[in-house]
Swiss-Prot record:
Gene3D superfamilies referenced in this protein's UniProt entry, alphabetically: Glutamine Phosphoribosylpyrophosphate, subunit 1, domain 1
Native organism taxonomy: Eukaryota, Fungi, Dikarya, Ascomycota, Saccharomycotina
Xref: InterPro entries: Ntn_hydrolases_N, Proteasome_bsu_CS, Proteasome_sua/b, Proteasome_suB-type
Keyword Cytoplasm attributed: yes
Keyword Nucleus among UniProt keywords: yes
Domain of life: Eukaryota
Family recorded in the similarity comment: Belongs to the peptidase T1B family.
Subunit structure: The 26S proteasome consists of a 20S proteasome core and two 19S regulatory subunits. The 20S proteasome core is composed of 28 subunits that are arranged in four stacked rings, resulting in a barrel-shaped structure. The two end rings are each formed by seven alpha subunits, and the two central rings are each formed by seven beta subunits. The catalytic chamber with the active sites is on the inside of the barrel.
Record GO cellular component, one term: proteasome complex
Record-given protein name: Proteasome subunit beta type-6
Length: 241
């Protein structure tokens, strides 16, 4: 006859009990950055979730950090907020130490690398992207892993729906698997910069499609556009279900 495990049985008392606190969570959402010839775009949806619950329908994921540098750290929202605040403080201290000299985008990338690497034993659980203009006035997008490894890219998506959006960006921005008509797939289309209008349309299409397929993305879309004249913001509604 099978023994029923209870609080008094040996089977129950021998079962290991897990006493563990998980300090991390995933609050959903998606971000993406695209670099243009003389501009850069960073976008993110505004949904904040825990499991199947929506915590907020407006939780911004993209931030203007000054000096024509915009930033997003998506994943665990508390870690993302902490990293953005630390970087904004770094920008202020750079101004104090260098007589209000502007921080360049490549120096910003190196600074964020140090912030992330310094926390490598208890990392910020985020995918980080920054965007801005380089010394030549060209758009620049840098993406980071949680411990500080980074690279400059033409475009990058991160977060819940990155696996849905990135193949679309590879095709439409990096022109992967695109060939000149009439060449039977032998002559690749040359890379070219897209206009601001084309990029914003791609961003909106990317997020509109992602909201149809991923429950962690939706509600609103914030887009920050960086040009030599500064940073401007655009907002568009997304699906709320």
């Amino acid at each position: 006859m099978a023994t029923i495990a209870s609080e008094y049985s040996s089977e129950a008392s021998n079962t290991p009990i897990e006493h563990q606190f998980n300090p991390y969570g995933d609050n959903g959402g998606t971000i993406l950055g695209i670099a243009g010839e003389d501009f850069a775009v960073l976008a993110g949806d505004t949904r904040n979730i825990t499991d199947y619950s929506i915590n907020s329908r407006y939780e911004p994921k993209v931030f203007d950090c000054g000096d024509n540098i915009v930033m997003s750290a998506n994943g665990f929202a508390a870690d993302g907020d902490a990293l953005v605040k630390r970087f904004k403080n770094s920008v202020k201290w750079y101004h104090f130490d260098h007589n209000d000299k502007k921080l360049s985008i490549n120096s910003a990338a190196r600074n964020i690398q140090h912030l992330l690497y310094g926390k490598r034993f208890f990392p910020y659980y985020v995918h980080t992207i920054i965007a801005g203009l380089d010394e030549d006035g060209k758009g620049a997008v840098y993406s980071f892993d949680p411990v500080g490894s980074y690279e400059r890219e033409q475009c990058r998506a991160g977060g819940a729906a990155a696996s849905l959006i990135m193949p679309f960006l590879d095709n439409q921005v990096n022109f992967k698997n695109q060939y000149e008509p009439g060449t039977n797939g032998k002559v690749k289309k040359p890379l070219k910069y897209l206009s601001v209008e084309e990029v914003i349309k791609l961003v909106r299409d990317s997020f509109t499609s992602a909201t149809e397929r991923h429950i962690q993305v939706g509600d609103g879309l914030e887009i920050l556009i960086v040009t030599k004249d500064g940073v401007r913001k655009e907002f568009y509604e997304l699906k709320r279900d």
